[in-house]
A protein has these predicted regions:
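C-terminal membrane-cytosol helix-exit motif in multi-pass small-molecule transporters
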Residues: 1-14, 199-203
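C-terminal transmembrane helical hairpin of 12-TM major facilitator-type secondary transporters
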Residues: 94-139
Length: 216
């Protein structure tokens, strides 16, 4: 540890921002609504993902070992998502986010039907994993673009909201399971995803001019 401290060069943080940056960030509607979108979309994902294993076992009547294998597919889908993000995001950032959210919504909507066969479940989980992984990567990149002068503060807020979305998703999933049934978690997540999708589209169309002015 001592050698690391002595040998590594000093790399001061640039455009990190501080608490004083909060009023400035609060004046950027695209950024604020992106935070709202993040909370809702991540909640949508974890509404279903938190309960995916009992869903596959109790609703899909799948073998527990198979259910565990399905979860591993999420890890492999993350690799594919990283490659897709690196290749396509820079070409059309907004369209990339829209497509990623669409993948998430349709995956959740078709979750119940995918339990019919092993192939359909593996395929859907892989697509679902690509969708949510691309969402996480692209929304974080979007935050950096919208707050280039206070990146540390903006990303810290994003991380906090992301984690809040995880907790909220688990709560929504529990409520859906308790009052609607375990088989409804996909539909509940899809409904939340649709809300986040609509918010993202409408706020982007309404406030995109503020981003152009900000970067002049």
């Amino acid at each position: 540890m001592f050698l690391i401290i002595r040998l590594l060069p000093n790399l001061p943080s640039k455009n990190a921002g501080s608490i004083a940056s909060l009023p400035l960030l609060a004046k950027r509607p695209l950024l604020l609504w992106l935070y709202v979108t993040t909370a809702i979309v991540i909640s949508a994902h974890f509404t279903a993902y938190t309960y995916i294993e009992p869903f596959m076992i109790d609703v899909g009547h799948l073998d527990p070992n198979f259910a565990t294998a399905v979860l591993l597919v999420f890890g492999f889908s993350g690799i594919a998502a990283s490659l897709l993000f690196n290749r396509f995001y820079r070409l059309a950032p907004t369209k990339f986010i829209v497509v990623s959210m669409s993948l998430l919504m349709f995956s959740l909507l078709l979750l119940l039907f995918s339990t019919e066969t092993m192939i359909s479940m593996f395929s859907l989980v892989f697509i679902w994993g690509i969708g949510i992984s691309c969402i996480g990567l692209s929304l974080q990149m979007r935050v950096l673009k919208l707050a280039p002068d206070a990146t540390d503060v903006a990303t810290a807020i994003y991380s906090g909201i992301f984690n809040a979305g995880i907790g909220a998703g688990a709560l929504f999933g529990n409520l859906a399971t308790t009052y609607l049934g375990l088989n409804e978690i996909g539909y509940t997540g899809a409904a939340l995803g649709l809300i986040g999708f609509i918010i993202f589209i409408t706020t982007h169309l309404k406030y995109r001019h503020t981003f152009l002015l900000q970067n002049k």
